[in-house]
């Protein structure tokens, strides 16, 4: 034992420390992970919102420039002087017109719009002019360049991305990093399909891109037109590329919403895509943010979170260790105390930790205490029940009652007492048998103890196949106590039926105030239950409600008894059962005292036994007859009494009588049939047969019809017809001779009778049988 203690010493203490460490570590780790994840998501969300705002600002800045150029150029090219100029050849003598137009073009470039060049082309007079001067469309190259603009779009005014060409160019367009220009093309005149020329405003892409944020892996912003062509990009090398076949571009172009955000994968890299569609020129503004790059930027948050969690984890582990020592201190004291005193029994398994040793020790103490309490409780209960049995049987003196009552822990604190005597009505239609009666009475004992407060009753007891309980009235009046007794008895009946499926009746004594009167009270309760034969099942009978007049005059239904005995002699079981029920009903109704019941029932039983002997029927051995009176007096209900008499006497006697009659009837019927079969050729009459058999003709007629199902004359006619068919089929006897043998007056009567039964004449019947 000592070796085990050394090996397992403080095992639970280490588990407790481990538990507290886990209890403090897991929340810190979870909070740290949650904080990092939440911070990362918040950072990405903030960046997404920032990109959306940046995209809107970029759109506003660029469209402000484009709209300014568009409005200024539209206003200028719509003026009548300019339109007239397109029809002028602009020779040297028209220098003033050229100078005026050139000044206007230069004026348009003076606004802060990043315009680099303005071009005006006249198709009709074949000239064009820009910042460099006036030129003639005298070469095929220039002519083709000018004609190409009339075929590009149906719109009279549009923005387009172009490189420098022979007709429209900028000085910045010659640089490698600024090859593209954003050109505003307007066909002139604007409101006519008869194109005379065009006006073009050129903005270098490298100038407009200054209005966009700088390019980085985490900041990729560009603009595409409705065909997916990159118009502007903060990475100038990507300007002019087509993204029309890219999935995310097709998805956005197919959307009806003007703006939105979603995630996509491009070249196996996850991006956050933000887009904004322009209502001005059908361009779409895109911002692509690399999520891995964003997460790299959020790593600083992760390191800060890790540092904070590490500090919290260190503190929590320290507090866990100190807290475990503090909480374990009382457990350690208990453990060492039980370990020193060797509380473990030899047969028990050695404990695995401190708590198991303490638990086993406490269980041993509790088991010993419970056993002691249960023993004392059982002894006290048994002593109380034994005391109550002796009290009700009157085997205790006044002095013994007082001494033992107090020694059993009971207090004499009451105003009235009353004794309830309970009997089980019947075990018919229940799952119990007669052998279960004692167990059922003890079950009722337990039921009463559970459902009636202990201050309202003394210990219930089982006395002579009855259950008896003394109820207590501490302060109420006698009338209130009687009402309470009725309610309590009703409750006991309901509980017995619900829990035990039993029907019980209860007899209640008169109230008394001294325990020594319990014997008289028990006799009163038992006496009250004797009246249950007159009442129904589940009766509650108060002794003080009984008719106490002493009388020995009994009422007996003699006429009903005669009718019953006649029915038995006639073998009429149905009538016999009805008469038995009527006799018992009369006895129970007309005799109000239980002693009168017993006298009348005993008288009836004597007469039944006499009838049994008169009829020569023995249902019992002589020795058994002595027990019949004890059996019938033990029956408690009308139904039980009726069933016992019916099953033990009336029905068996009726069956015996019927069996005898059936045998006699069959013998008589067989004799009559024998005479008919051998003497059918003679003049047979029922009177003649009755004379020979020494019976009344009417009696023989009824017996024969009862046994055979047809009358005597019908049977004779049927048998003679049978013999006629046999003679016709098997002999050559003439029809006339057959009619004479069968005692027909003439052959015509025989022929008519035969044809009526068979449907053909005797001659035809004979021919039919012989032809078969």
UniProtKB/Swiss-Prot annotation:
Domain of life: Bacteria
Signal peptide start-end: none
One Pfam family recorded for the sequence: HTH_18
InterPro entries found in the cross-reference section: CdaR_GGDEF, dCache_1, Homeodomain-like_sf, HTH_AraC
Biological source species: Bacillus subtilis (strain 168)
PROSITE patterns the UniProt entry points to: HTH_ARAC_FAMILY_2
Segments traversing the membrane: 16-36, 301-321
Annotated DNA-binding residue span(s): 687-708, 735-758
Main localization (coarse): membrane
Protein name as catalogued: Uncharacterized HTH-type transcriptional regulator YtdP
Residue ranges constituting the HTH araC/xylS-type domain according to the UniProt record: 670-768
One Gene Ontology cellular component: plasma membrane
Cell compartments where the protein resides: Cell membrane
A Gene Ontology molecular function term of the record: sequence-specific DNA binding
Membrane topology: Multi-pass membrane protein
Keywords per UniProt: Cell membrane, DNA-binding, Membrane, Transcription, Transcription regulation, Transmembrane, Transmembrane helix
């Amino acid at each position: 034992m000592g070796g085990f203690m050394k090996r397992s010493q403080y095992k639970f203490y280490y588990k407790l420390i481990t538990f507290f460490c886990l209890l403090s570590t897991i929340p810190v780790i979870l909070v740290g992970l949650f904080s990092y994840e939440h911070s990362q998501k918040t950072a990405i969300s903030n960046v997404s919102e920032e990109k959306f705002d940046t995209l809107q600002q970029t759109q506003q800045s660029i469209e402000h420039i484009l709209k300014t150029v568009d409005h200024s150029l539209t206003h200028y090219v719509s003026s009548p002087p300019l339109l007239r100029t397109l029809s002028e050849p602009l020779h040297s003598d028209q220098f003033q017109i050229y100078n005026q137009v050139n000044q206007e073009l230069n004026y348009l470039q003076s606004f802060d719009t990043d315009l680099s060049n303005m071009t005006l082309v006249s198709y009709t007079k074949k000239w064009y002019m820009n910042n460099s001067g006036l030129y003639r469309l005298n070469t095929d190259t220039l002519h083709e360049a000018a004609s190409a603009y009339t075929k590009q779009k149906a719109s009279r005014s549009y923005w387009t991305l172009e490189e420098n060409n022979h007709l429209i160019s900028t000085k910045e367009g010659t640089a490698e990093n600024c090859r593209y220009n954003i050109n505003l093309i307007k066909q002139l005149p604007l409101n006519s399909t008869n194109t005379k020329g065009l006006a073009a405003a050129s903005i270098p892409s490298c100038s407009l891109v200054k209005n966009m944020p700088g390019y980085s892996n985490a900041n990729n912003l560009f603009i595409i037109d409705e065909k997916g062509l990159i118009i502007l990009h903060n990475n100038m090398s990507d300007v002019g590329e087509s993204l029309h076949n890219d999935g995310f571009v097709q998805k956005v172009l197919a959307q009806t919403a003007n703006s939105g955000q979603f995630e996509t994968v491009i070249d196996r890299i996850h991006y956050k895509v933000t887009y904004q569609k322009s209502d001005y020129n059908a361009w779409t503004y895109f911002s692509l943010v690399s999520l891995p790059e964003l997460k790299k930027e959020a790593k600083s948050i992760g390191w800060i979170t890790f540092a904070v969690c590490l500090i919290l984890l260190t503190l929590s582990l320290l507090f866990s260790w100190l807290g475990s020592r503090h909480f374990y201190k009382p457990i350690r004291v208990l453990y060492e105390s039980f370990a020193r005193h060797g509380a473990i029994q030899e047969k028990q398994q050695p404990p695995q930790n401190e708590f198991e040793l303490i638990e086993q020790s406490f269980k041993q103490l509790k088991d010993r205490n419970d056993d002691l309490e249960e023993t004392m409780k059982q002894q006290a209960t048994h002593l109380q029940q034994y005391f109550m049995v002796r009290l009700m049987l009157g085997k205790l003196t006044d002095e013994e009652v007082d001494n033992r009552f107090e020694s059993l822990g009971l207090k004499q604190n009451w105003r009235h007492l009353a004794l309830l005597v309970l009997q089980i009505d019947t075990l018919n239609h229940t799952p119990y048998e007669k052998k279960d009666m004692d167990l059922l009475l003890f079950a009722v004992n337990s039921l009463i103890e559970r459902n009636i407060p202990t201050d309202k009753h003394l210990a219930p007891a089982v006395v002579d196949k009855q259950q008896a309980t003394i109820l207590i009235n501490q302060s109420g009046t006698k009338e209130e106590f009687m009402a309470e007794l009725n309610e309590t008895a009703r409750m006991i009946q309901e509980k017995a039926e619900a829990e035990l499926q039993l029907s019980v009746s209860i007899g209640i004594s008169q109230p008394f105030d001294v325990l020594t009167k319990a014997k008289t009270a028990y006799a009163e309760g038992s006496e009250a239950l004797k009246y249950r034969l007159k009442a129904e099942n589940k009766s509650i009978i108060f002794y003080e409600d009984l008719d106490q007049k002493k009388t020995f005059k009994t009422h007996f239904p003699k006429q009903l008894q005669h009718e019953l005995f006649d029915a038995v002699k006639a073998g009429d079981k149905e009538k016999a059962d009805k008469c038995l029920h009527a006799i018992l009903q009369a006895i129970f109704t007309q005799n109000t005292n239980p002693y009168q019941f017993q006298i009348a029932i005993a008288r009836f039983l004597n007469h039944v036994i006499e009838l049994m002997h008169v009829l020569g029927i023995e249902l019992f051995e002589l020795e058994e007859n002595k027990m019949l009176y004890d059996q019938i007096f033990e029956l408690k209900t009308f139904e039980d009494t009726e069933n016992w008499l019916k099953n033990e006497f009336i029905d068996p006697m009726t069956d015996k009588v019927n069996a005898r009659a059936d045998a006699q009837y069959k013998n008589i019927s067989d004799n009559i049939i024998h005479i008919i079969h051998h003497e059918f050729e003679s003049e047979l009459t029922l009177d003649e047969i009755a004379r020979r058999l020494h019976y009344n003709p009417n009696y023989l007629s009824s017996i024969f019809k009862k046994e055979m199902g047809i009358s005597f004359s019908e049977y004779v006619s049927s048998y003679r017809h049978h013999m006629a068919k046999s003679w016709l089929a098997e002999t050559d006897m003439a029809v006339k001779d057959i009619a004479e043998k069968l005692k027909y007056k003439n052959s015509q009567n025989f022929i008519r009778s035969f044809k009526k039964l068979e449907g053909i004449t005797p001659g035809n019947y004979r021919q039919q049988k012989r032809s078969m």
